[in-house]
Amino acid sequence: MNKQQLASKIWESANKMRSKIEANEYKDYILGFMFYKFLSDKEVKWLKENDWTDEYLQDLTEDDAETLDTVRKNVGYFIAYDNLFSTWISKGSDFKADDVTVALQAFSRLIDPHHKKVFDGVFATLQTGLSKLGESSGARTKAIRDLIYLIKDIPMDGKQDYDVLGFIYEYLISNFAANAGKKAGEFYTPHEVSLLMSEIVAYHLKDREEIKIYDPTSGSGSLLINIGQCAARYMGNGNNIKYYAQELKENTYNLTRMNLVMRGILPDNIVTRNGDTLEEDWPYFEENDPVNTYDPLFVDAVVSNPPYSQAWNPNDKENNPRFSDYGLAPKGKADYAFLLHDLYHIRNDGIVTIVLPHGVLFRGGEEGTIRKNLIDHNNIDAIIGLPANIFFGTGIPTIIMVLRKNKKDSDVLIIDASKGFEKDGKNNKLRACDIKRIVDAYKERPDKIEKFARRVSRAEIVQNDYNLNIPRYVDSSEKAESWDIYASMFGGIPEAELQDLSAYWTAFPHLKAALFSSDNEAYCHLNVQNLKNAVLNHPDVVAFKTAFQNAFGDFDAYLKSALIDGMTQLNAAGEEERLSWEIFARLAGIPLVDRYAAYQLLDDDWKKIAIDLEIIQTEGFAATKQVDPNMVLKKDAEVQDGWVGHVLPFELVQSVKMHEEVAALRAKETRLAEIAGEYESYLDELSEEDKEQDFVNDSAFVAAEVKKAIKAREVEPATLSILKDVDVLFAEEKTLKKKVKDDSAALHQRTKSVIEHLTDEEVRDLLHRKWILPLMENLNSLPDAVLDDFVKQLDAVCKKYETTFEDVESQIADTEHELLGLLDDLQGNEFDMKGIAELKKLLGGE
């Protein structure tokens, strides 16, 4: 299984296993056991690298003081053989819940003193929560055994596995968050928002060799990790990043530490604290000697997603250096207190990205004063309005604010990104194209992007009384539908409404004149019969499609060279960005095609390509010719059900290498479907009396009873004829079903063999079909999508005034006249005729 499949399997099982335990609580147990496995496997790996064999491992006890000391100094902790995760697994039915209790107590006792801050108390939430996994010792043992068996297959023993482990950890956290309701906000920032903030920060820090990053409300730590990963792409050395984190809630603080350690971050680069960020600021100090170890923390970047509009205590904080130059946030809303905390802790050339409720942009009082001071101090770099319902557990409209200390320009970039998203269950989610559009706008800082972004001067903000509400500066609303009164009365197409399609007329300069004839300076009429054909066959439109085809004519070969020929060497993390630059460059001279729509197509395919590249680069090219057992759950047990391609899907290989066998099998399956239809037809021919006979049951023929009825010959001749035909169908169906089953099994086995014996060139061809052909097909569809949308809009304008009010009035008059004629023919009693006479008056008949 790839990491996506493994993560999905673990989540599905874990969600079933948690039963009545809240998702918010259960996550602490499964993630805690994952972390213990990671630490256990890491120690075993270090020991084996230092000549310990499996046999020697059994002698690993804390009674061996020399070994204990060596392991603690090198690994940061010590786990005895009896307490190793692998030992728990090997115990099988002898494993007991108490084994975990003993192991966790021993771990806490045997942490290396130099690593206390990283590991001390990290399993506290798991230890206290074990009792909730079952009411009896036996129930707890079963629940824990199920949990450790669930995660035993997660790889944790090599550099490449940090990504797999981290992916699964993030996947589980995000899914638990989706099921945790309002509590999700305590520990999780959606990955897409985290990625957006990370890209902005990493761009700002791209030229630095060493950086420090800090999250004062760290939650699960995912936001910090994403920043680190993005920054490492520019820096090249992830070990030159130091991570600082503070979190108020103990269980969430433990998630932060686990997540950072499991991503392969060096313990010396992790500095975390469990505390109240607003009450206990971070001049860093050792608890046992606060005066002599006082060290104010200033970092390159602060990122945070603090609790929204949280109550806090501003008393006696007027002279606190974090707030003294700006003011104190109101006690009922700590949003600006968190922001000022973040701003204080960056270096003069640092950057802050913080998620806040949009009310901070326009609320008055103390918040208005702070906002004014931030503008006057030139600290606000950008404001990004996010879509509604983007965070788990809250529908509050939110923004990302970007802040800096020594900003050279005095304007503020305001981006309204509230319209760009996709639905994901109950929530909205940023797409890859939405993130890139925002990040590109931040990097390029244009004067204006219509309905999306604008650079606003400080003078304009001051003129608006320091109100930063986004709609004041960027109008992203759609144009309201309007109706032209003249065209509604007399017909014709308003030139003003055609002008709304000006981008198309610019791209196709001669098209408008070919489609429309002018009635006067303000109105025109359509002079072609088939609008779509007239548009698509016009020379300007043909030239547009040809230009696109020329721009991407050799892109297939380009992709083949980049991805297929270079699959073992390319940097997968940076390749998508390089390909996006190439696509954007090719689209530079092509009007109308949205480059971000093209980027989304690339990203959709890249997710699949990246998984394959990761496998090939970590396991070798031979992995492409590998098949794996297809494991499925049957009656709570995992059993094998055939095989699946490790990289190459069976369906792809069959369509290319075994199309004749596949076609023959599909023909048999088609015939089976036809037989089912023929049964229905024969049933329809039966009388209702026949349908009550034993040879029909639940609207289906019964094979054995059909034979009996034929043999007895007690039915009508027509019915007997039907039954004989049905009996023949039963025989054919039985033969076909066996044949389909046998042929399917044979095809499956042959596909396995074909994959295992592919030549390298055949593999490259199949990868080309899997990776490149779908992307090319999607990209080549972009011009057609543009033209379809254009024709749809144009057709709507043309049809809008096709029927005038005069036409409607005429139709009404004709209908009334017709109705009057019908009323004249009606007969009835005295009262009926009086009613009809009155109706005729209303219709103008008298």
Describe the residue ranges of each PLM region:
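Conserved Class I SAM-dependent methyltransferase catalytic core
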Residues: 9-10, 16, 22-38, 330-403, ...
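A generic secondary-structure signal for well-formed alpha-helical elements
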Residues: 37-50, 54, 176, 205, ...
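Conserved S-adenosyl-L-methionine
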Residues: 183-304, 309-313, 320-326, 330-332, ...
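Conserved P-loop NTPase
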Residues: 400-441
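Eukaryote-biased recognition of long, low-complexity, charge-rich segments
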Residues: 433, 437, 441-451, 456
